Amino acid sequence: MIIAVDAMGGDNAPEVVVQGAIKASDELGIDIVLVGDSDAISVELGGKGKRGLISVHHCGETVLMDESPLKAVRNKKDSSIRVAFDLLKNGKADAVVSAGNSGATMAAAIITLGKVEGVERPALACAIQGKEGKVILIDVGGNVDCRPVHLLQFGIMANAFATSCLGLQRPRVGILNIGQEEGKGNEQVRLAYELLKKSPLNFVGNVEGREIYSGKAQIVVCDGFIGNVALKLSEGLGESISSRLKESMMSSMTGKALALFGRNFFKRFQKTMDYAEYGGAPILGIKGVGIVCHGNSSAVAIRNAIKMAVDYVENRVLERLSRQIAEFQA
């Protein structure tokens, strides 16, 4: 298996991206192609990583984080993200991982690979740690404006991802709303509620913001604007709680003693709240495998995103997703 990694994408590229790729190749034993400026990548690579597992594919352009996604992808055909998806399209890679401009990554994926038949809008799905296991939040930034049918398709695609990659049987699907009662929310959400209710999905109704992590639903559907805000609010809250807990522990001798004896517990606690653990968000609905990472991803996050890409390919999620979309529309 070969994973193409956009080495120039992200706030800390190429250093952190290369470090994450090395971790993935060493631990997973897979082939990785680092796409980007070969000189910059070689400096960071420095002969590290298992011999023969990491290669470099040079390209001369990079899509910056603040560039217009569609314009950049169309004009910069030699950019690292565009070239990475070209490798996938031409059979020289099995998946693409990028921590770069998420809009450009989505655009490059759709332009280069195309959409699964029947899918109107590909979406970003994020598997976060809930009270009773993983919870898939979809969409987390791919589509800020959605029609009700798009939300229905998000649920169908996430259902395929959950059953194949997370091993969930008939996962519970809910729609993010401002109240639990049927009839709540704006017109978009109310109409999507009816579509989801009539679908073969295991629909459990509305999910309030405070219930995202509760386990009421294992798949939470929303538009990309709300989903991105919810995800980043959770990330910020997790960082704040971890920071304040550490400050409180270090403020007294009793706290320091507790921190010393309970450090393994606190490490596990911090791990459940660290966005690096979920690595990235798969783009569901494209004819291929693409994983979008946080722009500020650490080496651990890049490694985990690469592992997610491997799981996606090995579990044949794309085939299952295509089949479920066709079945649900029949």
Language model segments and positions:
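N-terminal charge/polar-biased segments
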Residues: 1-5, 11-15, 31, 42-44, ...
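Short, glycine-rich nucleotide/cofactor-binding loops
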Residues: 5-15, 142-152, 292-298
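Short glycine/serine/threonine-rich phosphate/pyrophosphate-binding segments
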Residues: 13-17, 78-91, 95-109, 116, ...
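N-terminal glycine-rich anion-binding loop in soluble enzyme alpha/beta folds
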Residues: 15-67
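Glycine-rich phosphate/diphosphate-binding loop of Rossmann-like nucleotide-binding domains
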Residues: 15-16, 28-33, 38-42, 144-209, ...
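Phosphate/nucleotide-donor binding subsite
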Residues: 49-93
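Glycine-rich phosphate-binding loop
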Residues: 87-106, 184, 189-195, 199-270
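Glycine-rich phosphate/nucleotide-binding loop
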Residues: 110-123, 127-137, 219-220, 224-330
